[in-house]
């Protein structure tokens, strides 16, 4: 049985432009980095064999060098394979962070366990087959998973679980229901049609872009952000976790959220009986 951690939307370098207090912005940014250490702790605690990042590891395609070095050092400390696809914030177009010589040099030095998946083709691991569906531009009206419809599944090892790793919205959710990224909403772009995928050939669909915990189907999940990034908007708003996933070929995945968030965002309401109360 394969045991992995499904994460997404780390968004290292997020500016928190709506937070006026400079010290609070800095604290929020530091907690996003610290959450990577808590992902490592969960991986050790549950003897995970690999970590998935379903897009938006960075908040932009040109993050600050200090943030890049810090997160690479934290990823290197995980000491497990960390498989990453570009999302809409850190898409994989030429000239972006992933293609820079300095990033690639630092990655080799600090995080040799980071495996960037920018090609839409099967990746064969010892424990699984990963089917990456990276975003290669910020907004794309084509389905990043469309390449899977033409895949010859008979060429894949029959005994290994198959994992789709994708970033984007899912067909079937309206604009009010889709609570992805308020800074870069997906809208009609980057939409994934899960119904077009051959369900019997896929064991787990690891999604990113939705900032809340969300089960889309028996095999498809969004983990939400590992560190909360905004005020709660109701009981359905569950942030600050990763997903522990246990997989076997041909079986339904066993999925359990594991806490990684530290900060709590609270909405406070006051009722005044009269103007004199102020």
Regions of interest found by a model, annotated:
Residues 1-70:
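N-terminal active-site segment of His-dependent metallophosphoesterases
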Residues 8, 162, 203, 218, ...:
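Structural beta-strand/beta-sheet cores of well-ordered domains, especially the beta-sheet scaffolds
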Residues 8-10, 14, 190, 195, ...:
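Flexible, active-site-adjacent loop/turn segments at secondary-structure boundaries
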Residues 31-32, 37, 146-152, 252-257, ...:
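A structural signal for the main folded, soluble domain(s) of proteins
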Residues 50, 61-221, 228-230:
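His/Asp/Glu-rich metal-coordinating catalytic cores
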Residues 123-126, 223-278:
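Binuclear metal-dependent phosphoesterase catalytic core
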């Amino acid at each position: 049985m394969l045991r992995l951690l499904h994460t997404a939307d780390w968004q290292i370098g997020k500016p928190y432009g709506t937070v006026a207090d400079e010290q609070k912005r800095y604290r929020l940014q530091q907690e996003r980095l610290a959450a990577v250490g808590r992902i490592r702790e969960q991986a050790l605690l549950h003897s995970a064999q690999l970590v998935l990042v379903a897009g938006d590891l960075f908040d932009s395609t040109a993050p600050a060098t200090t943030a890049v070095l810090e997160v690479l050092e934290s990823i290197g400390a995980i000491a497990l394979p960390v498989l990453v696809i570009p999302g809409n914030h850190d898409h994989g177009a030429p000239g972006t962070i992933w293609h820079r010589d300095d990033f690639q040099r630092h990655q080799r030095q600090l995080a040799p366990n980071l495996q960037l998946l920018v090609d839409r083709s099967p990746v064969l691991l010892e424990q699984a087959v990963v089917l990456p569906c990276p975003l290669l531009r910020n907004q794309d009206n084509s389905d990043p998973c469309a390449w899977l419809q033409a895949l010859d599944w008979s060429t894949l090892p029959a005994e290994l679980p198959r994992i789709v790793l994708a970033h984007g919205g899912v067909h079937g959710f309206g604009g009010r229901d889709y609570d992805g990224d308020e800074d870069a909403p997906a809208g009609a772009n980057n939409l994934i049609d899960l119904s077009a995928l051959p369900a019997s050939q896929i064991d787990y669909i690891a999604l990113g872009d939705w900032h809340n915990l969300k089960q889309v189907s028996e095999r498809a999940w969004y983990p939400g952000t590992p560190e909360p990034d905004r005020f709660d908007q109701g009981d359905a708003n569950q942030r600050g976790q990763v997903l522990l996933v246990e997989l076997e070929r041909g079986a339904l995945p066993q999925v359990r959220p594991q806490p990684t968030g530290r900060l709590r965002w609270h909405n406070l309401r006051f009722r005044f009986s009269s103007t004199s109360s102020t």
